[in-house]
A protein has these predicted regions:
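Hinge/cleft segment of the Venus flytrap/periplasmic-binding protein
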Residues: 279-335
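Bacterial signal peptide processing site
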Residues: 20-22
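Extracytoplasmic "Venus flytrap"
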Residues: 33-53, 57, 61, 69-74, ...
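Periplasmic-binding protein-like
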Residues: 34, 89-100, 120, 154, ...
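Hydrophobic alpha-helical segments within soluble ligand-binding/sensing domains
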Residues: 131-153, 266-286
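An alpha-beta-alpha
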Residues: 54, 141-188, 289-311
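Flexible loop/hinge segments that line or gate small-molecule binding clefts
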Residues: 110-135, 252-259
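C-terminal motif of bacterial Sec signal peptides marking the signal peptidase cleavage site
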Residues: 15-18
């Protein structure tokens, strides 16, 4: 009887040990969170190229859990960032702040306990986090020089954005070096809302163009160098009303909008940069604190429209004439 009691006790102990032992848990799937710009996606240009890179990466790596977040404001994005930084877990995590308008909400924030943060298109350094910028000066200088036969209008979404100001200066410097024509600057809004004002852009340009015509300053063919983000389609909408303007394509090749209006496009290939960063993340490679890319990289380029022939201008020939000089100007500018 005593023997049977001992055996029963051993069986009970074994059963308890068996129930308490769990099978080896599978590692948690990598988690990628993207806080997109407040102007959102669907602009057919800058933001959409970033989304292309992110979705392409996730298609190649289905094990990655992707979360896209659309904040209503920069303050809302700050709350989402704080929530992400405070979260804990075992998964390998990465957060992308997909707009340089989020610089202030990241500045001074500690590194996450697990995971990493990347903010796009900023010249600033954020200790504990990573950032990169695709320099615009060289490509914008080349664009300005290629626009030598036009009166230029630099059309900005807002003032004070470092990336926009660098682009504007590059275009102005390149145009001045190659042309005696004037360059003017228009500004759409007084803040980041200028990146998402398609309808207002149409009305703004209609009014400003009428003022421009009656000012006595305008002469020659007019070319817009747009730094508008998601507001750019509004300018192309206006070009269907006024066929006498020309528009530099921006962020992506815009020739398809109207090959007779777009002499060239300044293409920013953020999707290629992001793919490199995300592949390094999965491979366990640490991200640099900060990186810069310029005209000599594959990440920014000016694409001439070979169909464009207004006044017999050869965009490809102009590109070849000024490319090397633009590279040197960018190097000097960075010093």
């Amino acid at each position: 009887m005593r023997f049977q009691s001992v055996i029963s006790a051993l069986f009970l102990l074994a059963a308890l040990l068996s129930c308490g032992k769990e099978p080896d848990a599978e590692p948690a799937s990598p988690e990628l969170t993207v806080i997109i710009g407040t102007d959102g996606y669907g602009d057919g240009s800058y933001n959409d190229t970033m989304l292309e890179g992110i979705l392409g990466f996730c298609k190649d790596h289905p094990e990655v859990n992707l979360t896209l977040q659309q904040p209503s404001s920069v303050a809302d994005a700050g709350k989402r960032l704080d929530s992400w930084l405070a979260a804990e877990g075992s998964a390998d995590r990465a957060l992308i702040l997909a707009s340089n308008t989020y610089e202030d909400i990241l500045r001074g924030k500690p590194a996450p306990k697990n995971g990493r943060v990347l903010i796009l298109e900023t010249d600033d350094v954020f200790p504990g986090h990573s950032s990169y910028i695709i320099r615009r000066y060289g490509a914008s200088w080349l664009s300005g020089a290629m626009s030598r036969f036009f009166t230029g209008i630099i059309f900005k979404a807002m003032d004070g954005n470092d990336m926009i100001e660098e682009s504007a200066r590059g275009f102005s410097d390149g145009h001045s070096a190659a042309s005696d024509n004037n360059v003017y600057t228009w500004t759409l809004a007084d803040g980041p809302q200028g990146f998402a004002m398609r309808d207002s852009t149409y009305r703004f340009v209609y009014r400003k163009y009428q003022e421009f015509l009656t000012s006595g300053e305008y002469y020659g063919s007019l070319l817009f160098f747009p730094l508008l983000g998601g507001s750019l389609p509004g300018l192309f909408d206006y070009s269907r009303y006024n066929g006498f303007i020309n528009i530099a394509g921006m962020d992506v090749d815009c020739t398809a909008y109207n090959p007779w209006v777009v002499p060239y496009s300044l293409c920013v290939n953020n999707h290629l940069v992001l793919k490199n960063y995300l592949e390094d993340w999965l491979a366990g490679t640490l991200w640099p604190e900060h990186q810069q890319f310029g005209l000599e990289s594959e990440f920014i380029q000016v694409v001439p429209n070979t169909q464009y022939n207004f006044a017999n201008q050869d965009m490809l020939a102009l590109y070849r004439d000024f490319y090397s000089q633009a590279v040197e100007k960018e190097k000097a500018y960075e010093k």
